[in-house]
Amino acid sequence: MVTIKIECRTIARGVAEGEVLLSEDALSFLGNVDPKTGVVVDPGHAIYGECIRDKILVFPHGKGSTVGSYVIYQLKKNNVSPAAMINIDSEPIVAVGAIISDIPLVDRLDKDPFTIFKNGDRVKVDSTSGFVELMDR
């Protein structure tokens, strides 16, 4: 059993564990995700049909409307939000959404998350301490 610890930059503080859901596509929470169910509803999106509830959602960055921050908040209020989010490079829409929703958010990992993580991996995000752990693989 090996645990890999990766340093990162903290955007929104917190600690969460969960299963990785990778999306190589940028994500617009307004329009791509149903705020009532947490399901990705855009048929052109890489993770179309997937539910982000309780996942460690890994995606390059957000895109789209500033309303996306409030969609993230609505996901949290509806108990269908991701447990944590990991970005290559966070932008203000996702950052604000994570902060107001108390969802841990990190970016700028020391290692490329798309080469180190696989869908279904167990990951701990400790954005308070500035690291992500890939649990026993």
Swiss-Prot record:
Keywords: Isoprene biosynthesis, Lyase. Pathway: Isoprenoid biosynthesis; isopentenyl diphosphate biosynthesis via mevalonate pathway. It holds the Pfam family AcnX_swivel_put. It catalyses: (R)-5-phosphomevalonate = (2E)-3-methyl-5-phosphooxypent-2-enoate + H2O. Its EC number is 4.2.1.182. One of its GO terms (biological process) is isopentenyl diphosphate biosynthetic process, mevalonate pathway. Transmembrane segments: none annotated. InterPro entries: PMDh-S-like, PMDh-S-like_dom, PMDh_S. The keyword Translocase does not apply. The active site is at residue 65. It is an enzyme of class 4 (lyase). GO terms for molecular function: hydro-lyase activity. Heterodimer composed of a large subunit (PMDh-L) and a small subunit (PMDh-S). Belongs to the AcnX type II small subunit family. Component of a hydro-lyase that catalyzes the dehydration of mevalonate 5-phosphate (MVA5P) to form trans-anhydromevalonate 5-phosphate (tAHMP). Involved in the archaeal mevalonate (MVA) pathway, which provides fundamental precursors for isoprenoid biosynthesis, such as isopentenyl diphosphate (IPP) and dimethylallyl diphosphate (DMAPP). This is Phosphomevalonate dehydratase small subunit.
